[in-house]
Every structure is written in structure tokens, then in C-alpha cells.
């Protein structure tokens, strides 16, 4: 008769637990990667569709000023497209900064000027998706903000790293300006403790 010692029994239980844990972590990783892939694909498809819709608005537009319709203020509505040619950044700008909106594009910060208005336009985006390349922006870089009304051109004045509580970064200004905001550090895992701010004046 074969006798199994208490130590052997414990060892077998430990091995079973380790195998179960390994399978659990592999499955969890696969689920997480699948979710990320689906989210990125969804965002890409939305950006393509929104870009086409914006091009159609531009084609039939021609207004001298930004038209403030009810739909322009609706969360997730397409406002325009922002481009920074030197760093190959091109992304559709949506109204608002809800979690869903920022998964699909960059968002106009409520309470700041709208495109076509005097003052400071605030735009926020995630550092690990649409605003990832902001880490490569330089002073004097050109920024284009395109809406159905036309293209507004900006030039970067300064770049600053600040606290999330610094509301002054998107404060109203007399001159027409543009402020881009994302989390910082760019490669931080989890909720980043600071904000990376790019400020530009209209040319």
C-alpha cells in the first residue's frame, strides 16, 4: 500500500493551485488584450467615420463663423479636427470630456471658448492614445484646427507640466489661443499625477 504523507498531499494541492492560478492569469491577460484591441478598433472606425462627416460639413459649409447649433453642444458631437503636422498628429475633436468621448477622440473642455470664438479653446485627450505624440511637440510648432468654417492656425508658445488642480491653464484669454492638455508622465502606469500642457496663440 502506498502512503501519501501530509507534505506530499500539500505539495499536490499547491501544484494544482499554481496551475489554476497560471490559467487564470493567462485568461485574464487575454481578456484584457481583447478589450484593448476592441477599444482601439472602435476608436479607429469612429475617427474614420467622423473625418468623413467633417469633410462633408466642410464641403457644404462655407460659413464665416462657427455655427452654434444645439447639436454642437451635445456630448460627443464632432466639432472639428486638430493637426500638428511636424509630429504627425491628426485627430477629430469632439464636444465634452466624458470617458466615452475621450475613448473615441479628443474632447473640447466645457467652459472654454468654442472654435471660432475669441478666447482660450481647451482640448483634452489621453496620453496613451490620441495625444501620445504630444510628448514630441516643440515650441513654435504649428497647429491647425479645422472646422466647417475653415482652418484656424496656431503656433506653440510654451509647454508646461503642472498639477491636475491648476485650473488656470485653461483660463479665458483676451487673444485667441489654444490649450492642449493630457496626463503626465506619458509612460506612467495608472492614474498619472500631473498634466502636460501645450499652449498656442492664433496666427
Q: Predicted regions: what is each one?
A:
Residues 2, 13-203:
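Solvent-exposed, non-transmembrane regions of membrane-associated and secreted proteins
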Residues 2-8:
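N-terminal low-complexity, intrinsically disordered tails enriched in Ser/Pro/Gly
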